[in-house]
Amino acid sequence: MGRSSLASRRLIALFLSALTLLMTQPAASAPTARFGLPFADPPGPDTWLLGQPYGNTVGAFARRRDWYRAGQGVHFGVDFSAPCGTPVVAIGDGVVLKVDAREHGSGPHNLLIAHPNGYVSLYGHLMERPLLVVGQPVRRGEMVGRVGDPDLTCTSRPHLHLEIRDRGLRRAFNPHLLIDADWEALMLVGPFGRGFQRDLDNPRRWQSVWDQPDVRFGGPLINDFRDPWPRDWRR
């Protein structure tokens, strides 16, 4: 009886130890955030707000055949609405890779920073050419530019367009998974709609900021749905 009770206690102890170990291990499908936000100030109506999130947004679906065609039809970055001139900071340590690289869009000015973890961050729609040179090291939180307006008015739609790409610049990744921020709170307010386009043949796919596809630039459209919702008014 005593030996049986001791064996039972040992089994329970082993089970609890294993359970504790499993609970303290990070989930394999949940990558650790590697970067910070591109602003030093906290969000607010006088500083910045989340605009359009990354992914299969309703807005990107509507322009999938023109604005977003090169990115397989989805919004391949995150838009942060902010007044023109708002300082933009580097989201991580790195080295300046490109300045005003027109082949990557996001005019009137842009900046690309290569990070030691293999990612490249792109800062688009900057107000002026960044005062940086290729090869210059930058630190996380260092000012690297100022928010501009792609329409050159500063009253139309001033915002920062931020992308996270691979070193070859051929793939874009979901920044919501890589930037340490309270995205749940940031999604509550802002100037753009929060909806993601729904494929009624697979209605649960790509319906949150956490579940969005990587982009392969130049690849085929991935959201040209047969039965979309909201309906495609252009058809």
Question: What residues fall within each predicted segment?
Answer:
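Bacterial N-terminal signal peptides that target proteins for export
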Residues: R3-I12
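Zn2+-dependent peptidoglycan hydrolase active-site motif and core
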Residues: I91-P130, R157-H161
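Short amphipathic beta-strand/extended segments with alternating polar/hydrophobic composition
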Residues: G51-Q52, V58, A62-R64, Y123-L126, ...
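Glycine-centered loop/turn positions within well-structured domains
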Residues: T86, S121, G145
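Surface-exposed, glycine-biased beta-strand/turn segments
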Residues: T24-H109, R140, L188-R235
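Conserved, short, structured surface segments that act as functional micro-motifs
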Residues: L111-H115, Q136-W206
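Bacterial N-terminal signal peptides
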Residues: A13-L22
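Short alpha-helix capping/helix-loop boundary micro-motifs
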Residues: A82, R129-L132
